[in-house]
Amino acid sequence: MSAEDLEAQEDELLALASIYDADEFRKAESVQGGETRIYLDLPQNFKIFVSGNSNESLQNSGFEYTICFLPPLVLNFELPPDYPSSSPPSFTLSGKWLSPTQLSALCKHLDNLWEEHRGRVVLFAWMQFLKEETLTYLNIVSPFELKMGSQKKVQRRATAQASSSTELGVGGAAAADVDQEETVDERAVQDVESLSSLIQEILDFNQARQTKCFNSKLFLCSICFCEKLGSDCMYFLECKHVYCKACLKDYFEIQIKDGQVKCLNCPEPQCPSVATPGQVKELVEADLFARYDRLLLQSTLDLMADVVYCPRPCCQLPVMQEPGGTMAICSSCNFAFCTLCRLTYHGLSPCKVTAEKLIDLRNEYLQADEATKRFLEQRYGKRVIQKALEEMESKDWLEKNSKSCPCCGTPIQKLDGCNKMTCTGCMQYFCWICMGSLSRANPYRHFTDSESPCFNRLFHAVDINGDMWEDEIEEDDDDEDDDDD
């Protein structure tokens, strides 16, 4: 490495660290490289939707979601010794909501930008392009259709390229032929398992970012007329009127102490919005909330005995249940639940007991009379009651259901997705298969290096439904079959 290249690399990394905060840029510790997260600015009222003929697509089709934020594009890069004088940075570009074909188009444009900047540093130009021009370059408009690319197909392509490179050398004729046939760049990674998980991740990320933005803004409370940060405020879900938590706390406490539990409306005159039980619970003391909950339930039952509340924390709207039945369907979120246990409706099967309620159920059963015991056995099932009596506590849960981060030891549970994991404690990347730490500059090299024990196992042991893949991938398979003929 020449002194000029080393100085240019150090200056560029230092400049990026000063321009972007820690959430957007992180320098690798062991190599000249790092990771950038590109958060795109979306137009107002940007909508996403799903369509298709697979079972998973049909379950989500017909719904449009208005969002303000999308998960970031992640650019992992490593600077070679002769950068920027001769060679470009090696990189991978990953994203959850762009298909492999779209990510490949971005990778190709990054290559073109390097050609334009050859001999000069290019990382800032790459980041600016991804942040400001991605939507325009890919012709993405609202409503935007979410798509999935075939990870199995991508893995087969990576295997073919690796074998071709091994036989003829990197850049050989066979490798060049493979590159010409493929439309998906091996540097493009759509790190999401399925459309259903993709939609949920987008909605969760959008809610988290909206909360973060709300908490960082200043709002004028219409009660005390003081400006306060959003983290010290709360807004009513229906009308979006904002008040400071201190004023709402006093307002709620006075109403609850007076028994006016149905009068927790928005303080704005003539506004019909009502605080949710979750909002009330957040502000008032536990004993006062217990009084509120009891009075609210009692007043509701006095007026209409067949009304229950949706158990979802984000909804909690009143729901009518059918006479003589135990099933109720929320008209707002369409959640079907059992009116006894407040969990997903389970038909004639006994109510399930969560781990948190096992101890309470055991104590209640031991202190109950014979009639109450028979009722509990009928509601939860005798087997569940017996299990609650036998189990004193849920020990060894972490050992059976989680693995420890190789860096900080934080217990991590894998729900779904690929085998490239991120520790929620120290943000270290690691492999779920071998539990080895991964490079921040290029965490996917562990799965693409033919010498690695986890080569081509990014989605190992993940149940992937082949019906969800794009028609363009199926057409590629048909073309390959025709070529074989």
UniProtKB/Swiss-Prot annotation:
Chain positions of motif D-box: 37-45
Residues holding Zn(2+) 2: 239, 241, 266, 271
Residues the record lists as Phosphoserine modifications: 349
Protein's UniProt keywords contain RNA-binding: no
Gene3D superfamilies documented for this protein: 1.20.120.1750, 2.20.25.20, Ubiquitin Conjugating Enzyme (3.10.110.10), Zinc/RING finger domain, C3HC4 (zinc finger) (3.30.40.10)
Changes after translation: RING-type zinc finger-dependent and UBE2E2-dependent autoubiquitination.
Name assigned to this protein: E3 ubiquitin-protein ligase RNF14
Organism expressing this protein natively: Mus musculus
Lineage, top ranks: Eukaryota, Metazoa, Chordata, Craniata, Vertebrata
